[in-house]
Design a protein with these regions (language model features):
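Transmembrane-helix boundary motif in ABC transporter permease subunits
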Residues: 89-119
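Transmembrane alpha-helices
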Residues: 147, 151, 183-216, 240, ...
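Short cytoplasmic-facing helical segments at TM-TM junctions of multi-pass membrane proteins
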Residues: 160-205, 226
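Alpha-helical membrane-protein architecture signal
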Residues: 59, 73, 77, 81, ...
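Generic hydrophobic transmembrane alpha-helix motif, especially the helices
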Residues: 120-156, 163-164
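Periplasmic/extracellular loop-to-transmembrane helix junction in inner-membrane transport proteins
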Residues: 44-92
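Transmembrane alpha-helical segments of polytopic membrane transport and secretion proteins
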Residues: 1-32, 258-275
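Glycine-rich helix-loop "coupling/hinge" segments at transmembrane-helix boundaries
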Residues: 136, 164-165, 212-249, 268-275
């Protein structure tokens, strides 16, 4: 009888497993430790609350600015909507223009010879270095902000599309042509699927660069946006609003990255498999 009970207990232990992976568990543990240290430093007043308010104060302020009271004549959701609108418009423009440009560069040495020097000349320059030019040429309105974000996203997207085309195995292209496929069919059914993993990776990189550029671009003559909210709060020494805004910026960037990763896994399930 005791043997049966021990076997059942042993099998029960074997069936139960920690639901989270080791990496996720370590990440959550790290965040918990950081929050605990932050709370302890604030509770012991090792740093003035003016410079480092406690986590509960930041959370309370976040809930306040998310409500009707808002901050700087707009709620948190209105600031967030303004930022997301800018990044989405710039990302769509980079996708519509950057991917075809990268594919054309990968397929045509002539096109690559014309466009590659231009992209390689402007790509190493930090996007914010172009901000004064954008303001001079396009004013301080929305166009300059969206165009600056587009400039930041375009190069990673175009160069990733180029790398994706170059990574397609030539034997597959020759096999498709030998079976009578037209150029359009080879492009659509062979080259694009083969280049898609690199293209999506470029989108992830470009979105990260574009999001950081967006926050900086909103410091210039903006009336709404997460960057504007953080900058305005800093001018009034509202550290709790600054930290709340930084937390929202980080969370949105993390969610966008997770979304693109999920899209990449769905569209390219074969990526990473041994060919």
């Amino acid at each position: 009888m005791s043997v049966l009970i021990n076997e059942k207990l042993h099998s029960h232990r074997l069936k139960w497993r920690w639901p989270l992976s080791r990496q996720v568990t370590l990440s959550i543990g790290t965040l918990a430790v950081l929050l605990t240290v932050w709370w302890a430093v604030a509770a012991l007043q090792l740093i003035s609350p003016l410079f480092l308010p406690p986590p509960q104060q930041v959370l309370a302020k976040l809930l306040t600015i998310a409500g009707p009271q808002g901050f700087m004549d707009a709620t948190l959701w209105q600031h967030l909507a303004a930022s997301l609108t800018r990044i989405v418009l710039a990302l769509l423009a980079a996708v519509v223009i950057g991917i075809p440009v990268g594919i054309a560069m990968g397929l045509s040495p002539t096109v690559r010879g014309i466009l590659d020097p231009i992209i390689e000349l402007y790509r190493p320059v930090p996007p914010l270095a172009y901000l004064p030019l954008m303001v001079i040429w396009f004013g301080i309105g929305e166009n300059s902000k969206i165009l600056l974000i587009y400039v930041a996203i375009f190069a990673p997207v175009a160069m990733s599309a180029l790398a994706g085309v170059k990574s397609v195995q030539q034997v597959r292209i020759r096999a498709a042509r030998s079976l009578g496929a037209s150029r359009a069919q080879v492009l659509w059914f062979v080259i694009l699927p083969g280049a898609l993993p690199e293209i999506l990776t470029g989108l992830r990189i470009g979105l990260g660069v574009g999001w950081s550029t967006l926050v900086a671009a909103e410091l210039i003559a903006a009336t709404r946006g997460l960057g504007f909210m953080v900058q305005s709060a800093g001018e009034f020494l509202a550290t709790d609003v600054v930290l709340a805004g930084i937390a929202v910026i980080a969370i949105i960037a993390f969610l966008l990255e997770l979304g693109l990763r999920a899209l990449q896994r769905r569209l390219t399930p074969w990526h990473g498999e041994v060919q």
